């Protein structure tokens, strides 16, 4: 099986508000569950670093950006729905594609075993 991709993410928040902290907690939970060891997350407080928000054209918080692997994807607002976050960042598709590839390979191996035993 191919090595897993490394995911580079940026979470833009506005201070230590309950909404920002909830977004960070939920996101860390998703990443540790689904992508443990293959992600880097940078949290950017736009109140402390407004120039970074301006450079990256961030207009609202929380905003989550997937930088790598391409394409860049963003989710703005509520990050509490795990599936919405994964789909919005094209991460669920990657997860399903990896599982689909594994399933396809397993099916092919089973078919080969069946064909060999029939002959």
From Swiss-Prot:
<comment type="similarity">
    <text>Belongs to the KaiB family.</text>
</comment>
<comment type="function">
    <text>Key component of the KaiABC oscillator complex, which constitutes the main circadian regulator in cyanobacteria. Complex composition changes during the circadian cycle to control KaiC phosphorylation. KaiA stimulates KaiC autophosphorylation, while KaiB sequesters KaiA, leading to KaiC autodephosphorylation. Phospho-Ser-431 KaiC accumulation triggers binding of KaiB to form the KaiB(6):KaiC(6) complex, leading to changes in output regulators CikA and SasA. KaiB switches to a thioredoxin-like fold (KaiB(fs)) when bound to KaiC.</text>
</comment>
<dbReference type="GO" id="GO:0007623">
    <property type="term" value="P:circadian rhythm"/>
</dbReference>
<dbReference type="Pfam" id="PF07689">
    <property type="entry name" value="KaiB"/>
</dbReference>
<dbReference type="InterPro" id="IPR036249">
    <property type="entry name" value="Thioredoxin-like_sf"/>
</dbReference>
<keyword id="KW-0090">Biological rhythms</keyword>
<dbReference type="InterPro" id="IPR039022">
    <property type="entry name" value="KaiB-like"/>
</dbReference>
<protein>
    <recommendedName>
        <fullName>Circadian clock oscillator protein KaiB</fullName>
    </recommendedName>
</protein>
<comment type="subunit">
    <text>The KaiABC complex composition changes during the circadian cycle to control KaiC phosphorylation. Complexes KaiC(6), KaiA(2-4):KaiC(6), KaiB(6):KaiC(6) and KaiC(6):KaiB(6):KaiA(12) are among the most important forms, many form cooperatively. Undergoes a major conformational rearrangment; in the free state forms homotetramers as a dimer of dimers. When bound to the CI domain of KaiC switches to a monomeric thioredoxin-fold (KaiB(fs)). KaiB(fs) binds CikA, leading it to dephosphorylate phospho-RpaA.</text>
</comment>
<dbReference type="InterPro" id="IPR013474">
    <property type="entry name" value="Circ_KaiB"/>
</dbReference>
<comment type="function">
    <text>A metamorphic protein which reversibly switches between an inactive tetrameric fold and a rare, thioredoxin-like monomeric fold (KaiB(fs)). KaiB(fs) binds phospho-KaiC, KaiA and CikA. KaiA and CikA compete for binding to KaiB(fs), and KaiB(fs) and SasA compete for binding to KaiC, thus the clock oscillator and output signal pathway are tightly coupled.</text>
</comment>
<dbReference type="InterPro" id="IPR011649">
    <property type="entry name" value="KaiB_domain"/>
</dbReference>
């Amino acid at each position: 099986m191919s090595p897993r991709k490394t995911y580079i993410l940026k979470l833009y928040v506005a201070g230590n508000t309950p909404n920002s902290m909830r977004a960070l907690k939920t996101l860390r939970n998703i990443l540790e569950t689904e992508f443990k060891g293959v992600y880097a997350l940078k949290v950017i407080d736009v109140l402390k670093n407004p120039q970074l928000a301006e450079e990256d054209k961030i207009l609202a918080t929380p905003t989550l950006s997937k930088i790598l692997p391409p394409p860049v994807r963003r989710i703005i607002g509520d990050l509490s729905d795990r599936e919405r976050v994964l789909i919005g960042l094209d991460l669920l598709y990657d997860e399903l594609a990896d599982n689909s590839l594994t399933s396809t390979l397993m099916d092919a191996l089973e078919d080969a075993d069946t064909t060999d035993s029939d002959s």
